[in-house]
């Protein structure tokens, strides 16, 4: 009878260790699968953005986005007004 006392506790401890390690391994596997799915989605998003960037060409310069209506006859008649120049405005404003 004394033979079973030690082996009973040892058996339940082994079961806890076995099930605990299996559970931990399962959680790690689940984590790897979730990270893989997120990485695939991120990769597809990057490829789509790269494809859209290639289709649209280079990004337009901010000055070209202003779309100021100026006809070609106005350009030839227009004299450069230095009072609107940034350096001129910066010099005339007190600091």
Curated annotation (Swiss-Prot):
Lipid bilayer topology: Single-pass membrane protein
Compartment(s) where it occurs, according to its Swiss-Prot or TrEMBL record: Membrane
Pfam families: LST1
Annotated keywords: Cell shape, Immunity, Membrane, Phosphoprotein, Transmembrane, Transmembrane helix
Signal peptide: none
Coiled coil segments of this chain: none
InterPro entries (UniProt xref): Leukocyte-sp_tscrpt_1_LST1
Similarity remark: Belongs to the LST1 family.
Name of the featured protein: Leukocyte-specific transcript 1 protein
Organism: Mus musculus
Name of the gene this protein is made from: Lst1
């Amino acid at each position: 009878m004394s033979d079973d006392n030690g082996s009973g506790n040892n058996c339940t401890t082994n079961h806890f260790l076995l099930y605990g390690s299996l559970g931990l391994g399962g959680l790690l596997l689940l984590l790897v699968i979730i990270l893989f799915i997120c990485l695939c989605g991120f990769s597809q998003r990057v490829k789509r953005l790269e494809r859209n960037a290639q289709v649209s060409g280079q990004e337009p310069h901010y000055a070209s986005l202003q779309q100021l209506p100026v006809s070609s006859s106005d350009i030839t008649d227009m004299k450069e007004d230095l009072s609107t120049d940034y350096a001129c405005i910066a010099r005339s404003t007190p600091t």
